[in-house]
């Protein structure tokens, strides 16, 4: 009996997540902006980019700059 309640609860959670835009479900498999920056040879900085580097994007959800 507990198993059926658990399955029903899980199904309701998934359906409510899909109805609200599916941020959790669509976010699976996406790389973070920090990962993309560092893997392309950049570094994430909250301050200005060092000399001889330029801004290539953002990190931490737009709170920092990706300098390369």
UniProtKB/Swiss-Prot annotation:
Presence of keyword Signal: yes
One GO biological process term: defense response to Gram-positive bacterium
Species classification: Eukaryota, Metazoa, Chordata, Craniata, Vertebrata
Organism name: Pan troglodytes
Gene Ontology MF, one: CCR6 chemokine receptor binding
Protein name: Beta-defensin 1
Pfam families in the record: Defensin_beta
Record keywords: Antibiotic, Antimicrobial, Defensin, Disulfide bond, Membrane, Secreted, Signal
Signal peptide: 1-21
Family stated for the protein in its record: Belongs to the beta-defensin family.
Domain of life: Eukaryota
One GO cellular component, as annotated: sperm midpiece
SS bond list: 37-66, 44-59, 49-67
Subcellular location: Secreted; Membrane
Described function: Has bactericidal activity. May act as a ligand for C-C chemokine receptor CCR6. Positively regulates the sperm motility and bactericidal activity in a CCR6-dependent manner. Binds to CCR6 and triggers Ca2+ mobilization in the sperm which is important for its motility.
Propiece span(s): 22-32
Subunit composition and interactions: Monomer. Homodimer.
Principal localisation: secreted
